[in-house]
């Protein structure tokens, strides 16, 4: 059994290079750490022939060399320029003297021996009082009836207090050093770009008209007219609802159905071929290959194929979907691609050309521009009083839009007389009272007691129809005040004859309840 050798990993290159003191370091590790590999040699040889100094390649700093651009200053940049203050007496030479500078140690308090002198405060009284009282007041005739009184304010008393405290108080006179560099003057400069910022001029003088920018608000008739009246002309209208702005690129090759190199161009006169091309496809049946040739169908005769109207439509086997097109003349039409089967070999291969069938739609002439007017045909063939209106309409259309004719409506007669339009009046009226409420609506029929219709049948002994009255054909007068009571009683709650929704049945019509004796 073969023993599989185990691959032993080599130590880290950093550890191997550290142990190379004896000279047994691998060559690849040595070249890597001493930068003596093939890549390092190529860089050394290339740098000897090509000088790339100053471009900052291989370093983190890059500076523009000769021939490069310098960045322009942007607008609104604030620069700090140190200048001397107004009270500075610093010489123009070195800021410090050439002598040694004394150092002050930390924690040492500076003391200056000075003598404190307290000034004497002397009270000086004012020579003139604060309030002046005149001897006499001038009389103003415009101010009458007013009492003017002068108020005298006493002078306040001033008390001066002598300062008390120790006399050995140190007073330090601290002056700014001559070499103080904390005094700066900040100046800013803003550059305006006239391409993006317009010049704004504010005029404070009101009514000044000597400037160049004058605003004159006036009508159309003030001043000289420098314009020119140009009459607008209408261009030709678009041929489609959404006109294409880009030019239509011409299609080449087999995608161009109008190419005579790939397709035979045929104009179709029958629109049926474009709408239903399957009517031009027909075939023959061979009885020898039918599954049941001896059925009872000998008397049925197969319809002979219809002969195409055009000879170019023969031998068509396949047609494509219809597509609209626009030819070079600008006319719109519908076209299809067809495949003919003129020759068929024994192996079943059909040979035939491809034909482009196109059907051009009729051109719609602009009757308004060519003829100037459109003649309206009479669609109503009735000969009656409406003939005068038709004649008037034709007269208006023939004379133009500016001619109008006043038509007297009373002059037009009616096909029916007023007597025929009057409805028949019924002598047996039956009114209906409708009581409407927000919640419900009740309809109560009201029968006129002066007219009674003849009933279908008379019930002897009934309260609805009396038996002792001789009812003849037609309406008769019946007195129902004593003999018949109405089934529904409507109470009259108003003086003016207004009926309310207060109805109830007559007590005689209520069903009698049987009493139960316990």
From Swiss-Prot:
Belongs to the papillomaviridae L2 protein family. This is Minor capsid protein L2. InterPro entries: Late_L2. GO terms for biological process: microtubule-dependent intracellular transport of viral material towards nucleus; symbiont entry into host cell; viral penetration into host nucleus. Interacts with major capsid protein L1. Interacts with E2; this interaction inhibits E2 transcriptional activity but not the DNA replication function E2. Interacts with host GADD45GIP1. Interacts with host HSPA8; this interaction is required for L2 nuclear translocation. Interacts with host importins KPNB2 and KPNB3. Forms a complex with importin alpha2-beta1 heterodimers via interaction with the importin alpha2 adapter. Interacts with host DYNLT1; this interaction is essential for virus intracellular transport during entry. It is found in: Virion; Host nucleus; Host early endosome; Host Golgi apparatus. It comes from Bovine papillomavirus type 5. A motif (Nuclear localization signal) lies at residues 2-11, 511-517. The gene is L2. Keywords: Capsid protein, Cytoplasmic inwards viral transport, Disulfide bond, DNA-binding, Host endosome, Host Golgi apparatus, Host nucleus, Host-virus interaction, Late protein, Microtubular inwards viral transport, Phosphoprotein, Viral penetration into host nucleus, Virion, Virus entry into host cell. The keyword Disulfide bond applies. It comes from the Viruses. Disulfide bonds join 20-25. GO terms for cellular component: host cell; host cell endosome; host cell Golgi apparatus; host cell nucleus; viral capsid. Residues 68-100 are annotated as: Disordered. Its main location: virion. Highly phosphorylated. Minor protein of the capsid that localizes along the inner surface of the virion, within the central cavities beneath the L1 pentamers. Plays a role in capsid stabilization through interaction with the major capsid protein L1. Once the virion enters the host cell, L2 escorts the genomic DNA into the nucleus by promoting escape from the endosomal compartments and traffic through the host Golgi network. The keyword Magnesium does not apply. It holds the Pfam family Late_protein_L2. One of its GO terms (molecular function) is DNA binding.
